[in-house]
Amino acid sequence: MTPLMVKGTLFGLLLLSAAVWDMRNREIPNLIPALLLLCGLIGFRPAASAAGLLLVGGPFLLAAVLIKRDGFAIGGGDVKLKGACGFVLGVWPGLIQTVLSLSLAVLTGLVECRLQKQPLSAVRLPLAPFFCFGGVSAYWLTAFALQI
């Protein structure tokens, strides 16, 4: 098994554990982003990892700090998870993860809004399952298909 495959497998398993934990408990334990950072050391590219951490995780930190409104919350666990994902993936795959994750989260929120017959602002979704889908998709897409 190549280092790229080991890294991708660990990345996927850690994101899956974050997704399950977030769905059950509505929080993400600090250990998961810490282990993701360690996973990012496999095939470590310092500039890409640092840029990914800042440019992928940074907007989530800003949103969590600046947007305070009923019905909208990005938790600290989500911010740490996205920063760690950016560290593992780098900038472009991290941005692909963000677009895929948030697009699916919005679609899911709209469907739930319709099914539950409640306003969109009342829908509460854990984000880690969407980050898991987007992260695994972005990793394997960029690792093998696009060769970025």
Locate predicted features.
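A membrane-topology feature that recognizes alpha-helical transmembrane segments
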Residues: 1-148
